[in-house]
Amino acid sequence: MEPLCPLLLVGFSLPLARALRGNETTADSNETTTTSGPPDPGASQPLLAWLLLPLLLLLLVLLLAAYFFRFRKQRKAVVSTSDKKMPNGILEEQEQQRVMLLSRSPSGPKKYFPIPVEHLEEEIRIRSADDCKQFREEFNSLPSGHIQGTFELANKEENREKNRYPNILPNDHSRVILSQLDGIPCSDYINASYIDGYKEKNKFIAAQGPKQETVNDFWRMVWEQKSATIVMLTNLKERKEEKCHQYWPDQGCWTYGNIRVCVEDCVVLVDYTIRKFCIQPQLPDGCKAPRLVSQLHFTSWPDFGVPFTPIGMLKFLKKVKTLNPVHAGPIVVHCSAGVGRTGTFIVIDAMMAMMHAEQKVDVFEFVSRIRNQRPQMVQTDMQYTFIYQALLEYYLYGDTELDVSSLEKHLQTMHGTTTHFDKIGLEEEFRKLTNVRIMKENMRTGNLPANMKKARVIQIIPYDFNRVILSMKRGQEYTDYINASFIDGYRQKDYFIATQGPLAHTVEDFWRMIWEWKSHTIVMLTEVQEREQDKCYQYWPTEGSVTHGEITIEIKNDTLSEAISIRDFLVTLNQPQARQEEQVRVVRQFHFHGWPEIGIPAEGKGMIDLIAAVQKQQQQTGNHPITVHCSAGAGRTGTFIALSNILERVKAEGLLDVFQAVKSLRLQRPHMVQTLEQYEFCYKVVQDFIDIFSDYANFK
């Protein structure tokens, strides 16, 4: 029974109290009493009122408390299976119900219709209003999927230990059935379900993350279903809890049941890792021919919520499509429970296909459909909203990835001719980049008055979520701040530090950052002065040494090689408590002189040489962050970082995506790659790189 509204409770209680107080004489007149004298109304009526009033107030408070407790409980966000755990990794029964049972409107579920792609942006804007209220309503209108199916096999005593979570089970009608092993009852069971794609029946298998006792079954399923691709959407541990048992060897070979699994290759990228396995059954009647299985492990899903941007997921999904053979069996997709992130991935794939085929998307209908195949697919309203964000990203920007062999033709199209640049194509691409919203609400620290004084350009402030944090000086507020941002590399998160050229009063902070974050490489892309304006305080000594705070910088070497000055500094921390071997480091600065005061470099070779020299230095000193600065820490700095990432990908994959590389940087620090000229320069450098290494094998 639903609790009464508080206003109704108040409306009910006051008349009742008035009746009880006002009718006291009526009640007295109807009573037969045996008192020896006449009653004293002046004494009995106030006494009764004083007794009843506290009781009524107490009743009212209790009813209000019950209502608000129920209301708060109903409004609590749907939690994922990873959020509520007992120490042994099993969900408590009461917490399970919050996952499984979704509130329903008493008037019945609301209807949701397909959205034409041209209306997608506006529909998302409407649904996102009021803290995504309409997205939550839409999500909560989804059927859970439990009513439509039975779970007899999953609930058998022999199979209960095979389920990671006792409330996330496969339907009998859509479960994956393994071959029965002789003498082992229920050995045909695994917690996995067939899931349809947009048009393809059973395109996917949605599975839980293998447990130690189900790893053999997992590989048996991969072999029997002829699957060639595994998509993994969880880390082995998150928040110190096991989400998935490691079901592959780090190197060499291992046998799981009767399936031998050998590692053939492993490539680690910033958002995901690709592992290649050779698998082969070991049978008494001889071995069958081995098969190649690719595992694509998405590593950028945070422990809480969803990825900050869908860019990484879209790149990952494209790589899955590229690597999965045409005639292979179902793609095996798993996270921990096999419903939340797994469902999110499958829905994005299906709706992208629908977008191409019908120029519309129908997320609500598709999620409802696949929940009939595996209950609770897409587990939270945040995941549901993320699906829409990914689809909008794809619709607005499309696929801008290029093979190196098609770059020249692409540039001709963008430029109109090979001699005179018709900037229409490039200008349109760059215009889309300028539409990337600057998230001022995420710049609170940099916009504090004390920290604004440390900014060279007040429009270029680091975001709070990836700013470089210094150790706080004792008794001195705001000393943990510097205008610097961590930026992802091609293979490694936080591979770069993008910062402004130090000011006279921030030099000490600059060297503290270099020391505390163990940066051995500095890339400088500006002169100290340009056009008679200060662009960067000279933070190093021309000869001898200089001390800033507790750090002494001594110059050991200064050589000029073409357009690059290479300076080696001996950096010493002057702290008595520090161990001697930890007090001294060598830091190398690459000062690029090839950037003119106005515009961009005339050719790309100087930048290619600079990037190569920096990468060689990193290999020798370890992959600590590379500190990159110009004057404001956005234009030339962003161009250098973008080119480093783009050229690294060209060498590794023979692919490039200048647009998404720059867009990703702008989501990490405002105004990265600041001008159309700098954006065009990125394309020019890649073309020069390909011309220099025209033999494809030289950089693939």
Curated annotation (Swiss-Prot):
Residue positions, PTM Phosphotyrosine: Y696
Binding residue positions for substrate: D303, C335, S336, A337, G338, V339, G340, R341, Q379
Pfam families listed in its UniProt record: Y_phosphatase
GO MF term set: identical protein binding; protein tyrosine phosphatase activity; transmembrane receptor protein tyrosine phosphatase activity
Post-translational modification summary for this protein: A catalytically active cytoplasmic form (p65) is produced by proteolytic cleavage of either isoform 1, isoform 2 or isoform 3. Isoform 1 and isoform 2 are phosphorylated on tyrosine residues by tyrosine kinase Neu.
Tyrosine-protein phosphatase domain boundaries: 135-394, 426-689
Active site: C335 (phosphocysteine intermediate), C630 (phosphocysteine intermediate)
First-tier enzyme category under EC: hydrolase
Coiled coil: none
One example of a Gene Ontology biological process annotation: protein dephosphorylation
Keyword Transmembrane helix: yes
Residue ranges, Cytoplasmic side: 70-700
Glycan attachment residues as annotated in the record: N23, N30
SMART domains with a match to the protein in the record: PTPc, PTPc_motif
Induction entry: Up-regulated by 12-O-tetradecanoylphorbol-13-acetate (TPA) in HL-60 cells.
Gene3D superfamilies: Protein tyrosine phosphatase superfamily
Superkingdom field: Eukaryota
Subunit description: Monomer. Isoform 2: Homodimer. Can form oligomers. Dimerization is increased by oxidative stress and decreased by EGFR. Isoform 2 interacts with GRB2.
Family: Belongs to the protein-tyrosine phosphatase family. Receptor class 4 subfamily.
Protein name per UniProt: Receptor-type tyrosine-protein phosphatase epsilon
Biological classification of the source: Eukaryota, Metazoa, Chordata, Craniata, Vertebrata
